[in-house]
Amino acid sequence: MKKQILQLNLEQTSSAAAEDTNLDCSLAGYDYVLPPERIAQNPAVPRDSSRLLVVNSQTTGKETPPLHQIFRDLPDILRPGDLLIMNNTKVIPARLYGRKSSGAEVEILLLEERKFNCWLALVKPGKRFKKGTQIIFEGLGMRNLGIENSPQYSVASPHQLTATVLETDKATGGRLLQFDLPEGQSLVQLLDKFGEIPLPPYITTSQAADEQYQTVYAEEPGAIAAPTAGLHFTPELLQKLRDRNINQAFITLHVGVGTFRPVEVEDVATHQMHEEWIEVPAATVAQIKATKAAGGRIIAVGTTVVRALEGAAASGNLQEFCGKTNLFIYPGYKWQVVEGLITNFHLPRSSLLMLVSALIGRERLLNIYQEAIASQYRFYSFGDAMLILPEARGVEQ
């Protein structure tokens, strides 16, 4: 069946829930103080040894506190017949270092390929990169070892890359770069030699290897950040889940730079969400519908999966989808597909924090975050996880 290629423009304008309506729509309502030492600089080893905070009741308080478990306990927490939906995107080595013809050093972050070997990129420093500026990139082997000693290079690989600035992108402030390569050769094929895996800006002292910032099921190159809720899974844990009839299905959402950008408008309902490319294949749609028909539950692994599934169901009916979405989920959103969520702990004032608030309520989520901080949980991309079970969500607004 030919895939339906669509362009979603799904800025949600639903009203917030009656309780705490003003704060639900106020940027200040999503603030909290995180001690810097709670920001994880390195991942848990092994992956599934990270902690898991489980929210499994409609209220959270002294009588019904969240459970504190280990991620590898997941097969005993979920039910046979549940379905985990995972994002199989793969982080590309999107950070490149180069220089202008004047010798001035340049750092760029590739955002997306607009057409063959023509990329939108953030450039630092960016003020003087006008149309026609040329940038020269040297491979990591040349920069670190000397090209003749680098095992990363084959005879067919170029020693340098050049790119020309075509224009400034007003929406992102980035530059459109045309890379000059031999006919038929793709920049993506050379990124392992010329680029580095970009880590989030709050990770400053990490010793993690590149593969530790990839999920074990990453297959589709295109992201500039990992879908971090999936970093906790190991092949052995996935097999244990399958052995208990807790199966997995996949979507693809290439995580973009917007995931790190804070919401800046005071009225969050007016926030303009960034676009991200998603694919929800027919096989995944079929698995979801079969799971629901059999009484199983749909558990999203990460906020990227939430956006993909809910975006694909924007018409009211989940369907195969391939295209872009700028879906913004915040309190008051009417859920279509997702019933439970595995997610890491998110930054204050972020759209991701608002998304999770839409599932269980803003005030309640912030109270859970305070308990996580007091209990020494590790936050953000390399941090611990939380599981919101369907029975924790309460009555839909």
From Swiss-Prot:
It holds the Pfam family Queuosine_synth. Pathway: tRNA modification; tRNA-queuosine biosynthesis. One of its GO terms (molecular function) is S-adenosylmethionine:tRNA ribosyltransferase-isomerase activity. It comes from Nostoc sp. (strain PCC 7120 / SAG 25.82 / UTEX 2576). One of its GO terms (cellular component) is cytoplasm. One of its GO terms (biological process) is tRNA wobble guanine modification. Monomer. PANTHER family: S-ADENOSYLMETHIONINE:TRNA RIBOSYLTRANSFERASE-ISOMERASE. Transfers and isomerizes the ribose moiety from AdoMet to the 7-aminomethyl group of 7-deazaguanine (preQ1-tRNA) to give epoxyqueuosine (oQ-tRNA). It is found in: Cytoplasm. Keywords: Cytoplasm, Queuosine biosynthesis, S-adenosyl-L-methionine, Transferase. Its EC number is 2.4.99.17. InterPro entries: QueA, QueA_dom1, QueA_dom2, QueA_sf. The keyword Iron does not apply. It is an enzyme of class 2 (transferase). Belongs to the QueA family. It catalyses: 7-aminomethyl-7-carbaguanosine(34) in tRNA + S-adenosyl-L-methionine = epoxyqueuosine(34) in tRNA + adenine + L-methionine + 2 H(+). This is S-adenosylmethionine:tRNA ribosyltransferase-isomerase.
